[in-house]
Amino acid sequence: MGSAEPISAIATFENVSLADQTCLHGEDCDKLRKNFEECLKLKGVPEDNLGIALGLCLYSCATIGTSNKVNVQPTSTFIKASFGGGKELYLTHGELNSFLGSQKLLEGKPNKLRCFCRTFQKDYISLRKEYRGKLPPIARANRHGLPAEDHYLAADFISTSTELTDLQQSRLLLARENATHTEFSSESPVTSLKQLGRGLGTGR
């Protein structure tokens, strides 16, 4: 039996696609990005605005939620944005769902929208960093015990990531705990900013 190729021989992991039900990786991620950018261009988004258009779509998903239980009318507005020079993006929920349903890369995924958003989580975080303070707050951030500066962590598709600081990741984990907290739990939910971001190594 021949020896396996050392992992150091892999120049980059960007071209590695892994079996994952929650998001796409490597070449699959690149293909999905290209397909969605083509969709955006057909909708009138200029080439140099494709990045921010994707980010805004992800932010719209964050505010609405990506649960399969979310019920919205197919004809209702998903996103509307102007890019100057008469260029405007207008996309309905039905059009977004049609795009997701047409992607073979998403076949078999239990939640296509959430998989799509998690695939481009880095773009979502980058948008927040670039336009910090300009984006409308996500309403459920308060309910989850998140401070205003990190309201974007209330997105139900975001996961722990190297793009987030340890403090932000600890806040994210506490917010998830609060989101699943029930009235029958014996533990009290976070109720003050002092309880937030105490580090990942806490006993709570």
Curated annotation (Swiss-Prot):
Chain intervals with Polar residues compositional bias: 183-194
Principal subcellular localisation of the protein: virion
Quick one: a GO cellular component term?
Answer: helical viral capsid
What is any one GO biological process for this UniProt entry?
transport of virus in host, cell to cell
Task: Briefly state the protein's biological role.
Answer: Component that constitutes the body part of the virion. Also acts as a movement protein that is involved in local cell-cell movement via plamodesmata. At least five viral proteins, CP, CPm, p6, p64 and Hsp70h are essential for cell-cell movement.
Q: Tell me the keywords, alphabetical order.
A: Capsid protein, Helical capsid protein, Transport, Viral movement protein, Virion
**Which species expresses this protein natively?**
Beet yellows virus (isolate Ukraine)
Keyword Transport in the entry? The reply is yes
Checking InterPro entries in the record gives: Closter_coat
Q: Any idea what this protein is called?
A: Capsid protein
Where is the protein found, in the record's own terms? Answer: Virion
Region annotated Disordered sits at 183-204
Q: What family classification does the UniProt entry report for this protein?
A: Belongs to the closteroviridae capsid protein family.
Establish whether keyword Transport is in the entry: yes
